Amino acid sequence: MAPCDTNKDQQEEQQYSNAVELALSPVLPFVMKAVVELQVLDAIAEAGPGAQLSPSQIASRLPGPAGAATIVERNPDAPEMLDRMLRLLASYSILTCSVVDLHSDDHDSPAPALVDRRLYGLTPLAKYFVPDQDGVSLAPLLCLTQEKAFVDSWYQLKGAVLEGGIPFHKVHGKPAFEYLRKDPMFNEVFNKTMIDRSTMVNKKILESSYKGFEQVQKLVDVGGGLGATLNLITSKNPHIKAINFDLPHVIQQAPPYPSVEHVGGDMFESVPKGDAILMKWILHNWSDDHCLKLLKNCHKALPDNGKIIVVEGVLPVMPDSSGATKGLFQMDLQMMAQHFGGKERTQEEFLALATGGGFSGIKFECFVCDLWIMEFYK
């Protein structure tokens, strides 16, 4: 199908297409969330490596609503609806797509229904949203960012720019971390997100060239959540005695782990002593002033040869179009919308925090999963 006007400026046509795609961009994450919650990607994965399934085959494998064996039993239009959703994901290389020949010479086999002419499979990208051998994926992160509590805060972004304030606080009347205590379902999604993403990142860190845990005897994870990070670290480094430190209401939900002691408290008051402190995705939640107070508390808790192991994204000074940079800028805006003073930082900003907190400098040790492992040394 040729363009109506072959003399049109192709560059202008492309720019127009890009602008329309941008205007409609919210469609993709909402469709992706529905596909994840319907367990479509899981159904394709369970069909085996390299499997390609038609919409009807996928629909037949999905758990049905209450009282129905499959979703088709309740909604005969489900295969067509799935097809329309999945072809969008294929256009973003989230799924593969192949087309069945409807005019096959094999007269013994019935021609597939029109809705089933497309077959869908998983790309390497899609596999990050299917539970891996550890039962974790990025699916909870996708669902968390689409949670109504977060989505509603974006409607206050304009007002926050005009009047000041934090969008999340404007909507809910309290900071995001306090809101977690109010909404158990939201808290559950948040904790699952932290566990899954931490497990994925931690495994990559432990498989990387980073050797910073080898000489550590006592490791304190500040803001360690339910302790999954320390469980992985101590499993790989059994010589380490670890303290998982977080707010008391978080620690109450933490399961027991060998070599890990759970301690509740307030990191802005004090932190437990150790010869190394781990902080992963902590500093980006807080303003510079809060970070300096926290870092000074860490400085007091460490011996002269102690260090903080910081795991965070590091912003480039100049924006570029790489996926890593886009992800960091998106996370930076998540922080701005949800946390007072929360932000991603550049190398220079991390150095200013380190020296302001009493540390001599920073070593940028290893780059894993778009994150830097940094050491703040005394």
Model-derived features: positions:
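N-terminal accessory segments
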Residues: M1-E178, F213, G358-G361, C366-D370, ...
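Conserved adenosyl
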Residues: A2-T6, D132-K326, G361-C366, L371-I373
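Short acidic-aromatic active-site loops that bind/stabilize oxyanions
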Residues: F30, N187, N191-T199, M336-E344
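Residue-level recognition of alpha-helix initiation/capping sites
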Residues: V35, E80-M81, G224, D289, ...
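C-terminal alpha-helical "lid/dimerization" subdomain adjacent to the S-adenosyl-L-methionine
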Residues: V311-G356
